[in-house]
């Protein structure tokens, strides 16, 4: 029967020459924050004759399950200290992880210093991201959840993947066990390399989350170095066009993302373009507390409205531009009932997002084979994160376009003051205008858009298109929708021609940033028409 001394001799004899493809797993170090599946992994390894070395809470978890483990203190000959801040940071461990087993000098040094080889490391990290995402963690608590030893072990084992394996994802445990069982305790070099790549992605993500947190606490302005990490949520069939590959990634450290909490109840897979439009539609309806609906096409709203119900808001939004709404993405901030579902009628839509659907509505909508029905029952607070746009070889980074804007902060530029109804429609149009690609013009009446001019290089062309839309579709009204309507412009009017075109069509109130060198000319044109105009002092370009 082997004595404790015999076991130690076996450890020393474990220093052996090996080629990169010929490594048998004889010793594993397990140290995890997320204990999911760790007992099953340890049991499987033990059944294969693998010696288990473990730390702190992981060792207690395994011992509680009746699994024999060797404490890290016994392995390193050095106690854990400083409330667990120092437990694995020791040359005996890292020499065992990093030794090249095809190098005589490495093997000589390992033998001389009685280094024991570690063939597999299973580590996952302190929950830094989850701690930050809680929102109520103190700075001290956040700092304590920065893992030091874990990333160091992961990187060491990943660097030496020619001779060691590293596990960072509980989802890989059973696959690794299966290969070990099938291969007489060995993991292939290809498996070890794949695990190493995953490990470095894990530590990169972790460091990016920490870096982002520190950058956010540096004060005003942007840090000298900008790092972000993203994790794949899903592959997409293709990108904007069929010849482009695509996937959707969520930003690491973000408290939510576009599809978080979204359940798809019906329809085909979401496409790249669906997700772009869905994000725009959702951001727009999240602006309103009252029932609201937005219909988006090619990342621009072609209709938006508020109403007494989701159905009423939808019908008003659709009436703005029923031609462009064909194949659109719809977001509504109220549950969909049968009346709403029936109002959709034969309209072809790509996506419908709502907080819920009653049974009758769902049954009626599922007749539309291809429509993607999405439910987001718990709408989180809108994100106001820093945003970035790719340019050649880099990123443009900016704060989100959100600024406190109240009626009291705005100034009337004209002789006539706006009426209360005009204020209501101007503020509604101004809110929608911020979500339209520049140059942007939004015409509104009675809490609904009646014409939108989007993405024009010329502001007067944007006005012309918005007026033409209103004249063509009339916002679903029998009477002239432009008579007494309001206009919002995302930037100032450089000339009086744009406002004049709108005034001639019947617009009675205008809201715009102001600040043009020709403001006096613009004001004179509006005064001459007996209309009202308000300056916000804030521009809302969107590209």
What is each residue range found by the language model?
Residues 57-128:
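Glycine-rich nucleotide/cofactor/substrate-binding loop typically near the N-terminus or early
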Residues 171, 175-225:
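Non-catalytic interaction/clamp surfaces of large macromolecular machines
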Residues 101-151, 155-158, 406, 411-420:
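Active-site/ligand-binding-proximal alpha/beta "capping" segment
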Residues 2-75:
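N-terminal glycine-/serine-/threonine-rich phosphate-binding loop
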Residues 9-30, 123-126, 206-208, 212-543:
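ATP-dependent carboxylate/acyl-activation modules
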Residues 39-48, 129-146, 151-152, 281, ...:
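Short, hydrophobic/aliphatic alpha-helical segments
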Residues 152-153, 160-176:
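Mobile "lid/hinge" segments at catalytic clefts and subdomain interfaces of large enzymes
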Residues 46, 63, 147, 158, ...:
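Anion (oxyanion) recognition and catalysis
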């Amino acid at each position: 029967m082997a004595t404790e001394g015999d076991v130690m001799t076996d450890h020393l004899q474990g220093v052996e020459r090996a080629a990169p493809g010929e490594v048998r797993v004889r010793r594993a170090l397990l140290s995890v924050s997320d204990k999911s599946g760790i007992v099953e992994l340890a049991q499987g390894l033990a059944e294969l004759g693998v010696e288990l070395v473990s730390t702190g809470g992981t060792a207690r978890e395994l011992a509680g399950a009746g699994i024999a483990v060797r404490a890290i203190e016994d392995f390193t000959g050095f106690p854990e200290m400083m409330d667990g801040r120092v437990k694995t940071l020791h040359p005996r461990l890292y020499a065992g992880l990093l030794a090249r087993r095809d190098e005589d000098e490495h093997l000589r040094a390992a033998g001389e210093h009685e280094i024991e080889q570690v063939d597999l490391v299973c580590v996952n990290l302190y929950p830094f991201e989850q701690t930050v995402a809680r929102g109520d963690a103190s700075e001290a608590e956040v700092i304590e959840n920065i893992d030091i030893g874990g990333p160091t072990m992961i990187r060491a084992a990943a660097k030496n993947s020619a001779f060691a394996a590293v596990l960072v994802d509980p989802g890989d445990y059973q696959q690794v066990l299966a290969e070990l069982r099938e291969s007489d305790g060995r993991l292939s070099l290809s498996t070890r390399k794949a695990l190493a790549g995953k490990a470095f992605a894990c530590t990169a993500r972790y460091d990016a989350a920490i870096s982002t947190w520190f950058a956010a606490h540096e004060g005003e302005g942007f840090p000298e170095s900008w790092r972000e990490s993203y994790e794949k949520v899903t592959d997409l069939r293709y990108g904007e066009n069929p010849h482009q590959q695509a996937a959707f990634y969520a930003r690491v450290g973000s408290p939510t993302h576009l599809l978080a909490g979204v359940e798809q109840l019906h329809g085909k897979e979401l496409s790249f373009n669906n997700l772009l439009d869905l994000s725009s539609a959702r951001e727009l309806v999240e602006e309103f507390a009252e029932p609201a609906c937005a219909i988006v096409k090619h990342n621009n709203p072609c209709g938006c409205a508020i109403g007494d119900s989701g159905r009423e808001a939808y019908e008003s939004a659709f009436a703005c531009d029923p031609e462009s709404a064909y194949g659109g993405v719809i977001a509504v901030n109220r549950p969909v009932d049968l009346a709403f579902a029936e109002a959709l009628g034969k309209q072809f839509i790509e996506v419908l997002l709502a907080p819920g659907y009653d049974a009758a509505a769902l049954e009626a909508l599922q007749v539309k084979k291809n429509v993607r029905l999405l439910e987001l029952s718990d709408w989180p607070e809108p994100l106001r994160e820093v945003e970035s746009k790719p340019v050649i070889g880099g990123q443009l980074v900016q704060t989100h376009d959100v600024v406190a804007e109240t009626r009291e902060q705005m100034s009337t530029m004209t002789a006539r003051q706006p009426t209360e109804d005009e204020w209501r429609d101007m503020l509604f149009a101004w809110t929608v205008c911020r979500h339209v690609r520049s140059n942007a013009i939004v015409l509104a009446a009675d809490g609904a858009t009646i014409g939108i001019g989007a993405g024009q290089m010329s502001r007067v062309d944007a006005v012309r298109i918005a007026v033409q839309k209103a004249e063509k579709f009339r916002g679903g009204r029998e009477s002239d929708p432009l008579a007494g309507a309001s206009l919002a412009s995302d930037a100032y009017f450089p000339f009086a021609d744009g406002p004049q075109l709108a005034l001639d069509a019947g617009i009675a109130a205008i809201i715009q940033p102001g600040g043009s060198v020709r403001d006096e000319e613009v004001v004179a044109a509006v005064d001459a028409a007996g209309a009202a105009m308000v300056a916000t002092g804030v521009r809302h370009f969107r590209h």
